[in-house]
UniProtKB/Swiss-Prot annotation:
Subunit and partners: Interacts (via N-terminus) with NOTCH1, NOTCH2, NOTCH3 and NOTCH4 (via ankyrin repeat region). Interacts (via N-terminus) with p53 (via DNA-binding region). Forms a DNA-binding complex with Notch proteins and RBPSUH/RBP-J kappa/CBF1. Also binds CREBBP/CBP and CDK8. Forms a complex with PRAG1, NOTCH1 and MAML1, in a MAML1-dependent manner.
Gene symbol of the encoding locus: Maml1
Tissue and organ expression note: At E9.5, strongly expressed in the telencephalon, first branchial arch, forelimb buds and somites. By 10.5 dpc, continuously expressed in brain and spinal cord. Also expressed in first and second branchial arches and limb buds. By 11.5 dpc, expression in CNS is weak but increases in mesodermal tissues. At 14.5 dpc, detected in epithelial cells in trachea, esophagus and proximal and distal tubules of the developing lungs.
Species classification: Eukaryota, Metazoa, Chordata, Craniata, Vertebrata
Gene Ontology CC annotations of this record: MAML1-RBP-Jkappa- ICN1 complex; nuclear speck; nucleoplasm; nucleus
Protein name: Mastermind-like protein 1
Organism: Mus musculus
List of residues that carry Phosphoserine: 45, 127, 310, 321, 367, 1019
Main location: nucleus
Amino acid sequence: MVLPTCPMAEFALPRHSAVMERLRRRIELCRRHHSTCEARYEAVSPERLELERQHTFALHQRCIQAKAKRAGKHRQPPAAATAPVAAPAPASAPAAARLDAADGPEHGRPVAHLHDTVKRSLDSAASPQNGDQPNGYGDLFPGHKKTRREAPLGVSVSANGLPPASPLGQPDKPSGGDTLQTAGKHSLGLDPINKKCLADSGIHLNGGSNSSEPFPLSLSKELKQEPVDDLPCMIAGAGGSVAQSNLMPDLNLNEQEWKELIEELNRSVPDEDMKDLFTEDFEEKKDPEPPGSATQTPLAQDINIKTEFSPAAFEQEQLGSPQVRAGSAGQTFLGASSAPVGTDSPSLGSSQTLFHTTSQPGVDNSSPNLMPASAQAQSAQRALTSVVLPSQGPGGASELSSAHQLQQIAAKQKREQMLQNPQQAAPAPGPGQLATWQQAGPSHSPLDVPYPMEKPASPSGYKQDFTNSKLLMMPGVNKSSPRPGGPYLQPSHSNLLSHQSPSNLNQNPVNNQGSVLDYGNTKPLSHYKADCGQGGPGSGQNKPALMAYLPQQLPHLSNEQNSLFLMKPKSGNMPFRSLVPPGQEQNPSSVPVAAPAASVGTQPTVSVASTHNSSPYLSSQQQAAVMKQHQLLLDQQKQREQQQQQLQQQQFLQRQHLLAEQEKQQFQRHLTRPPPQYQDPTQSTFPQQVGQFTGPSAAVPGMNNLGPSNSSCPRVFPQPGTLMSMGPGHAPVSSLPSSSGQQDRGVAQFTGSQSLPQNSLYGMASGLAQIVAQPPPQATSTHAHIPRQTNVGQNASTSAAYGQNSLGSASLSQQHSKGTLPPGLTKPQVPRVSAAMGSQNASWQHQGMPNLSSQTSGNSSVNPFTAAPSFHIQQAHLKLAGQQFSQAMPSRPMAPLSSAGAAGPMLPPVSAQQRNSAPASAPPQAAPQQGLPGLSPSGPELGAFGQSPTSQMSGRPGLHCAQAYPVRTMGQELPFAYSGQPGSSGLSSVAGHTDLIDSLLKNRTSEEWINELDDLLGSQ
C-alpha cells in the first residue's frame, strides 16, 4: 500500500502542478489578451476620441438647439422642457450648463472637454439606471464608448482608487457618480476597498454635502440602490463583471476570462475573508446602512449628535462591519450559516450588534474622549435602536426612514441616556474606556470576524479586556452599551454589573469581579480546553454568557437552527453552552433560556434585555438589587462549582485511571487483533472479546466512573474505545476520546455530557427543556454538576441519570433499567448502552428488535450481540461520524454488555425489557425521535459529539442514525443479527466480527472490509 501510495502522491503532485500551471497559463493569456485589447483600444483611441468629440459636439449642439427651442416655447419650465427628453437630456442639460461654464476656461480644447463632460454627464445620468438610454443618446456610442473607455480604465481606475474616472472635470455629481458607479461596476473584489476608500466621498454623496444638493440626493438614492443592486451581482458574478456586462458590452467577450482572472485573484484571499468583506459591504448597505447612513448621511448632525462619529466612515467599517460580521459570524456560529444573516441579522444583529455595540463605544470613545459616557450611551443606544428595531422588524425601523429617523432616534436616545446615564456617564473615564474599548474592539473584531466560533471566545476576550480594564471598561460598558451589556451581561453580566455597580456597589463589583475575573480568566481555558474539570468552573459563567448569547440567538433561530447551534456550540462551545446552563442554571437549570433570562433577564430577548439592562443598570438601586442577586448566584455558583470541582477532580482521577487502563487495553487489543485472525477464529475471538469486553467491563466499571468521569471528559470517545473492546478496532475512536474526546472538543464535557446529555437527551426526549438545560450541564461535566447534581448523582450512576431521564419515556425507563442492569458495564456505556439499548435497541428493536426480541428470549446475549454487531457495524459506520461515534459508543457498549458475562444474565432482563419495553420504547423513542427531531437535528451535528447520539440515540440512533447507518449497515447488521439469531455462536462470532468490523473499518478500505464481512457472513 505504501509503495503505490507514494507513486500516487507523486502522480497527484504533478497533476496538481499541471493544473496550476494550466491555470497560470490561462491567467497569463487573459492578462495578455487584456493588455492586447488595451493596446488596441489605446491605438484606436485617437480615432475613437475624434469620433466621440464629433458626436459630443453634435449632441451638445442638439442639446443647445433643443434648449433654445424649448426656451422659446416655454420660458417658464426649462427643466420641465428638458424632462421630456428623458434622463439623458436632463443630465445633459446640467452637463451642458457645465460645458458652457467650462467652455469659458477651456477654449483650448473645448470639444474634448465638451465630449468628456457631456459623455460623463450622460453616462452618469444613465448608468445609475443601468444604462438608461431613452433618447438614443445612449444608443450612440457615448454610452458604450464611455463605458468602453472606463472598461479597462475603469478597472485600473477602480484599482487606483477611482481618481481618474471621477476627476475628469465633473465637480460633484459625475465624480461621485462615477466613483461610486465604478465601485459598483468594477467591483472586481475591489468593491470593499473602493467603498472603504470612497467612504468619505460616499459620505459626502450620501450626506448631500456636495455643492449641488438636489443632485447628490437623487444620486445618493440611486447610488445607494445601485451598489446594493450590483453587490449581489458582483458577489454572484464573481467580481461583478456581470454587472459590468450591461454597461460594458465590449467586455462581454472577456467575461469568462475576466471571471477566471478575478476568481484567481480572489482565491488569494480566503473565502471566509471574502465573504466577510462582501457581507460587510452588502450588510452595510442593507441593515447597517440605515444606521450606516445615519452615520454617513448626516455627518453634520452626526457630528452634533455624536462628536465621536466624526470618523463615521472608519467607524462604520470597524463597527458596521463587525456588526455585520457579527451577524454573519454569529449565524455561522449558530450554524444558521451566514446566509440568513440578511434575515436573521436583525435579531442576531440585535444580539451581536449588542456585542459590537459594546465594541462600538470603544470605537466611538476612541475618537471622542470628550463624550465618552454619553457618546457611548448614544452610540450604544443608537446601535441598539438600529439593532432592536431590526429585531422588532427586520430592518423595519432602519428601512422606515433612511438616516434621518435614525438620527432623530439616536438624538432622542442620546438625550434620554444622557439623562439616564449621567451617573454612569460621569464615572466612565473616556480615555480609560477608549483604551479598554479599543483593545476590546480590535481584539473583538479580529476574533469575532474570522472566528464565529471564537465569538464566544471574543466575548471571553472582551471579558478579559473587561476584567483587565474592568473598572474602566465596565462603566463604559454599562454606559456605552447598557443594552449591549445585555449580551455580555451574562458573560460579563457579573462583570458589567460589577463594573456598573463599582460606581454604585463597589463591594459587589469587587466580589463579582473576583469571581468574574476567575470566570473571565477561566473561560478562555474552558473555551480552549475541552476538559470540564478545569474549564468547567470558569467556563460555567462564561458559558452563561454563551447561554445568554445562545438563547438570545436561539430565540431568533428556528428549532433546527437552535439545535444546530447547540450542536455546533457543543462541538466547540457546547462546553460553554452546557457550562452556561450551570452558571445560569443555578436557578433555572432546566430552562437555559430562562436561565439566561434569570441571570440576565434581558439577554434572552436582546431588545428587552437591552431595555432592561439600560433601566436596571441605569438605576443604581436596580443595579444593587441585581448585583445582590448576582452575588448570591455567584456565591451559589462558587459553592456548586467547588463541589463540582471536587466531584470533577475525583471523576477526573478516576477517568485518568480508567482512560489509562482503557487505552492500554485498547492498544493491547488493537495490537493483538489483526482482522484476518478474527475472520478465521471469529467464535474463538468472541471469548477473547468476552475477555476483552469483560476487561472493558472491568474497564466499564471504571467506565461507570468513566460514564460520569469520561462523561465529563472523553467519555463519548473513550467509551467507544474502552467500552468497545471493539473500540480497539476503533482504536482511532479510543485515541479520539483520549485526544479529541478529552482535549480537543469539550468532548470531555460532551462525553460527560453525552453520557448525561444523552441521558438528558433521552430524558430530554421526555423533557426538551431538560435537553437544553441538562445536556449542556451534562455537556459540561463540571457545570453538569448543576443538572448533574441531579444528573451527577445520576451520572455517578449513569443508569440513575438514565433512570430519571429515562423515566421520561418507557424507552427511557427501559434505559434506566438497562442502565441499572449493567451499571458496571453500562455506566460508561449506560448513556449509550442504555441509550443504545433503549433507543438504538428500541430502534433496532424497531428494525432488528423484532428479531432481537425473539432472539433475546432465546438468546438474551444475542440481543446485545445482535444489537452490538449491528451497532458495531454502525459503530464502524459511526466511526465515520461523531453521531456514529456516539452511537458507535452505545452500540459498542452494547457489545460489552452482551459480551460481558454479567451482560448476559443482566441483559436477559434487558433484552426482555427491551423486548417488553422496547416496543414501548419504540413508541417513546419514536416520540423522543419526534420530540428530539429538532434535537436530533441539533443532535446530528451534536451527534458528532454525542448529543446527536443522544437525540439520535433516542430518535435517530434507532431510527435515523441507526437506520440511516443501519440502512447502510442494516443489511450487514441484520445479517449479523440474523446470523446471530440462529445461535449465540453466530453471535459470538459476530461479536468477534464486531472487533473485526472495527479493525476493518479502521484499517481497511470499504471494499476490503465489505469483502471480509461478506466472508464472515458467508462463513456463518
